[in-house]
């Protein structure tokens, strides 16, 4: 395997492995609820445990990655992921699962700063937007894997056994993955001072907060909502897999498209408007109209999922957002904060209303319009 290809594989896996647990909860949610003996809304607290911790750590993830360097940062990412999957297989009960997922928050906080730093170090400028789209598609590769393979593994080995199968690739990447990064150099001084976001980064963080709320709510409860409409475990896995396939296509194709636009904020706005339509279609599903579930899942994959990759590409290419690693860490604070807040909030109204996530998407649309004005303001011109 060539060095360029191996670099792209490691970047994709660095994004995929920590996020796989999120899509696993969406896919295996009905089995987990039955086995753990907890109410359905408690699934939301599983997601909050991992992404809440990730959001907190993301405040310092950028400076930490700059201090560690990309090689040590990758090693910490993959080893913490392997530790999380080990604990998930070994610890009993609901709170054991909460602890295991919390450990995975370390890897999730590191993923974007480490991969963005590695891209800045190893990828030529003309290829950066495409590589960002590719590595961000790793998140949807995990959705595809979770939907296509985990239901079958869970039927044979149980949901814990299915997730334990992920330990082997995590260990292999922990040993081999960091070698793709440059050799460690002398460490820079470590500063734990939380950087203040620029005006444009603050607005983009707010948009990503809204996107995180919506995506986490949608994926966490899609499985149990579909089960309530009479869908089988295999069909639910197909929903998540389809969501993942559409997300991969959207991230790979739309990120370079956004890079060619004068201002990607307009692309964000269009995608978010379409995402609100996809959520509305999902809400109309009944036991006799499963096609609406498919339309909603595929639509969310094509629209809302791509916005995070576009946002990361904006941060990496536009110096007005700040240095790559710290600004990516701050952007992750917003995104992961939304992931932490969304499931418990939606759990309170689950089964009664889908208007909460639709309203949050429309709020993100308004913020996208604000971002276009901020980037066009005098002294804040978009840098390409």
Briefly describe each language-model feature range.
Residues 67-78, 259-273:
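Cytoplasmic membrane-interface "Motif A"-like loop-to-helix N-cap segments
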Residues 100-138:
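Cytoplasmic helix-loop-helix junction between adjacent transmembrane helices
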Residues 57-69, 250-263:
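Helix-to-loop junctions at the C-terminal end of transmembrane segments
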Residues 25-26, 200-248:
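Extracytoplasmic gate region of multi-pass secondary transporters
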Residues 264-311:
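C-terminal transmembrane helical hairpin of 12-TM major facilitator-type secondary transporters
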Residues 56-92:
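Conserved MFS/SLC helix-loop-helix module at the cytosolic interface between two early adjacent transmembrane helices
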Residues 134-178:
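Helix-loop-helix hairpin linking two adjacent transmembrane segments in secondary transporters
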Residues 318-352:
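A late C-terminal transmembrane helix in Major Facilitator Superfamily
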């Amino acid at each position: 395997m060539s060095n360029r290809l191996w670099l792209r594989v490691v970047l994709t896996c660095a994004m995929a492995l920590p996020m796989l647990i999120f899509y696993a909860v969406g896919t295996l949610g009905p089995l987990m609820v039955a086995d753990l003996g907890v109410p359905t809304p408690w699934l939301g607290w599983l997601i909050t445990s991992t992404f809440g911790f990730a959001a907190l750590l993301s405040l310092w993830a950028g400076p930490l990655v700059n201090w560690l360097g990309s090689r040590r940062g990758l090693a910490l990412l993959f080893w913490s992921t392997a530790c999380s999957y080990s604990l998930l297989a070994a610890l009993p009960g609901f709170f054991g699962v909460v602890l295991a997922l919390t450990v995975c928050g370390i890897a999730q906080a590191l993923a974007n700063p480490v991969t963005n730093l590695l891209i800045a170090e190893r990828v030529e400028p003309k290829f950066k937007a495409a590589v960002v789209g590719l590595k961000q598609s790793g998140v949807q590769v995990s959705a595809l894997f979770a939907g296509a393979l985990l239901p079958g593994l869970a039927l044979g080995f149980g949901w814990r056994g299915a997730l334990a199968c992920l330990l082997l690739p995590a260990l292999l990447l922990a040993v081999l993955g960091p070698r793709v990064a440059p050799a460690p150099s002398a460490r820079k001084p470590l500063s734990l001072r939380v950087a203040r976001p620029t005006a444009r980064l603050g607005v983009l963080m707010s948009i990503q907060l809204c996107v995180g709320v919506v995506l986490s709510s949608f994926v966490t409860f899609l499985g149990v909502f579909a089960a309530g409409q009479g869908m089988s475990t295999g069909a639910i896995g197909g929903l998540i897999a389809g969501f993942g396939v559409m997300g991969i296509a959207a991230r790979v194709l739309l990120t370079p498209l956004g890079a060619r636009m004068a201002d990607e904020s307009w692309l964000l706005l269009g995608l978010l408007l379409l995402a609100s339509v996809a959520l509305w279609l999902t809400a109309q599903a009944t036991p006799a109209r499963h096609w609406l579930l498919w339309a909603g899942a595929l639509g969310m994959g094509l629209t809302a999922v791509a916005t995070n990759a576009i946002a990361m590409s904006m941060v990496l290419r536009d110096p007005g957002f700040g240095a790559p690693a710290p600004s990516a860490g701050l952007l992750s604070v917003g995104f992961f904060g939304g992931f932490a807040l969304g499931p418990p909030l939606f759990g309170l109204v689950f089964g009664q209303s889908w208007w909460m996530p639709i309203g949050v998407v429309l709020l993100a649309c308004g913020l996208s319009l604000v971002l276009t004005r901020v980037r066009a303001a005098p002294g804040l011109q978009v840098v390409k």
